[in-house]
A protein has these predicted regions:
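A cross-kingdom feature that marks ATP-driven nucleic-acid transaction machinery
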Residues: 2, 297, 303-381
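N-terminal pre-P-loop "Q-motif" helix
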Residues: 2-15
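Sensor-1/coupling segment of RecA-like P-loop NTPase cores
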Residues: 27-31, 112-116, 126-157
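A short hydrophobic beta-strand->loop->alpha-helix junction that borders the nucleotide-binding pocket
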Residues: 30-32, 52-63
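Hydrophobic positions on the alpha1 helix immediately C-terminal to the Walker A/P-loop
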Residues: 40, 44
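Conserved NTP-binding/hydrolysis module of P-loop NTPases
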Residues: 49-52, 62-81, 95
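Mid-core helix/loop region of P-loop NTP-binding domains shared across ATPases and GTPases
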Residues: 78-107, 112-115, 123, 127, ...
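Interdomain hinge/linker elements that couple catalytic modules in large macromolecular machines
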Residues: 167-319
Length: 381
């Protein structure tokens, strides 16, 4: 799929690079998995000659250094003498080199340095503090595990706390871009097709690309692709969140499945799970940024709180894939499709509301957008 959207982000990244010609810049780029962070960075800096891309694979530090040295030798056309086994030595070399030669350095999956060697973060802090005044480096670090990136840069006990000079959060595509993409692949698309693409992918770049590249451009085709045997989407929710949640993932999954199924108040969820949930809900909201709490518009007290899953893909995944996983395990995917078709209109009614809210936000014409409800129910305003 060709590159769509992200013009504001590209402009901002290019402005940051220009600023780095005067003084060192340290930018963190965050966003959920598959949101197109890497593609965005490569696109923004495709014309930058001295641009280095380091991917933090789950290897030993020595193996990573060999990969990084290969990239440096290829891009900078400079021989690196001797064997380098510590990332700190590479980082120090690049900061010192940037004092005479501007460099853009992208480090992808930055949080995985914690697995490789946690002391890398404190080494970077010391090297950065000693060299940043004279350096002309555009350092961009990118990460997908939100909770870890948050700890690394926003926990005041961590060595890199406060070192960033800027932050960019890559969000899903807005409605206008989703519409542009679908019309490119299916000029005769219907409103139902557009709503299905928004519902199943949430505008997440890689999910949209998978649908389009597979020729799934109608509502029916998208539903079939979403729940097909061995579909990427079936396993994605679990793969995406297990690393975030760790050993407690089953309890978090149960909470998210209940919220996705319409149990949106703490009381409703606790009455089903029979446990006290304030700690879990707080973490889901603040540490993982997966749910948000809502109160009725204009209400000033914290009453009538409802919780929602913010990510459309996870919302549909927990509503159908996780909830009916037993059907998938025995190959009853056609039965699952019947379940989805039966409740599709009701389910997507809320998604349609979210779509129009996203459109209003994108227009930048409104100062406040929210719903109103009381104990009797929600009013359509």
């Amino acid at each position: 799929m060709k590159f769509f959207g992200r013009q504001n982000e590209i402009k901002e990244l290019q402005e940051i690079r220009n600023l780095s010609l005067q003084t060192a810049r340290f930018t963190i780029v965050t966003g959920r998995r598959r949101s197109g962070k890497t593609s965005l960075l490569i696109k923004a800096y495709e014309d930058v000659q001295d641009m280095l891309y380091f991917f933090v694979a789950r290897k030993s530090e020595a193996e990573l250094c060999r990969d990084f040295i290969e990239e440096m030798t290829s891009k900078l056309q400079l021989p690196i003498l001797g064997e380098v086994t510590r990332f700190a030595d590479i980082f120090k070399y690049l900061l010192q080199l940037s004092k005479i030669r501007p460099i853009t350095l992208i480090i992808d999956e930055f949080q995985d340095f914690k697995r490789v060697n946690p002391s890398i973060f404190s080494d970077m802090q010391k090297i950065w503090d000693l060299n940043k005044q004279e350096a002309h480096i555009n350092l961009v670090v990118c990460g997908s595990v939100y909770s870890l990136m948050n700890i690394i840069f926003k926990n005041n006990k961590q060595p890199l706390y406060g070192r960033q000079t800027g932050e960019i959060k890559v969000t899903p595509f807005p409605p206008s871009v989703i519409k542009e993409i679908l019309s490119t692949y299916n000029s005769a698309y219907t409103n139902d097709d557009l709503l299905a693409l928004y519902s199943y992918t949430g505008g997440v770049a890689e999910y949209v690309e998978m649908m389009m590249d597979a020729g799934a451009t109608t509502k029916e085709q998208m539903t079939e692709r979403f729940i097909a045997k061995n579909s990427y989407f079936i396993y994605e929710g679990k793969n995406m969140l297990i690393e975030e949640f760790g050993k407690d993932y089953a309890r978090y999954f149960e909470i998210l499945q209940l919220i996705a199924s319409g149990y949106t108040t703490r009381g409703e969820i606790e009455s089903i799970m029979k446990i006290e949930l304030s700690g879990y809900l707080t973490k889901l909201e603040n540490d993982y940024s997966l749910i948000s709490r809502y109160i009725p518009m204009f209400q000033k007290t914290n009453r009538n709180i409802r919780y929602q899953i913010e990510d459309n893909f996870l919302r549909v995944w927990f509503r159908y894939i996780y909830k009916y996983g037993y059907m998938i395990e025995v190959g009853a995917n056609k039965k699952l499709k019947m379940v989805m078709d039966k409740s599709y209109t009701t389910y997507t009614g809320k998604v349609l509301e979210r779509y129009f809210i996203a459109k209003m936000i994108e227009s930048e014409e409104y100062t406040q957008i929210a719903s109103w409800w009381d104990r009797k129910g929600e009013n359509e305003i």
